């Protein structure tokens, strides 16, 4: 797998005390990112969108801090990360704390919302596959 980029994952976690979502970030080094530029013609004209395909190798330095979403929701904390629908991924390293995803729109052009993911840590090329828009 060609490793062409670092990414920053912003994980959402519900805070039962404040009743708000909190966001924690983790920089992942050495992942593969591919951006597909889709266009479609509709009654409203030409629509375009970027579709992100991200593969995170299981041998990255941060792999040991990964928790499945269920464990992250109850036990995850500082230093852990996960992948779940609704998380945000920024292309490159980002050290900005956020309170909501809209904060990223003010700072970065290249980020996506996780819309699908799978844990493929088996076989000859173990990795996590992430889809986003």
Regions found by a protein language model. Give the residues of each.
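N-terminal intrinsically disordered, low-complexity, charge/repeat-rich segments that act as generic
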Residues: 1-28, 34
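Short, conserved turn/kink motifs that form compact alpha/beta structural patches or helix kinks used as
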Residues: 21-133
């Amino acid at each position: 797998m060609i490793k062409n980029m670092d990414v920053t994952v912003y994980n959402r976690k519900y805070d039962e005390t404040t009743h708000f979502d909190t966001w924690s970030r983790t920089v992942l080094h050495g992942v593969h990112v591919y951006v597909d530029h889709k266009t479609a013609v509709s009654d409203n004209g030409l629509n375009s969108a970027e579709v992100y395909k991200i593969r995170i190798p299981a041998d990255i330095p941060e792999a040991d801090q990964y928790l499945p979403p269920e464990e992250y929701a109850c036990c995850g904390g500082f230093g852990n990360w996960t992948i779940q629908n609704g998380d945000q991924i920024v292309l490159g390293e980002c050290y900005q704390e956020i309170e909501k995803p809209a904060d990223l729109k003010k700072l970065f052009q290249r980020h996506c919302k996780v819309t699908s993911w799978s844990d493929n840590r088996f076989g000859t090329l173990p990795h996590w596959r992430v889809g986003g828009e």
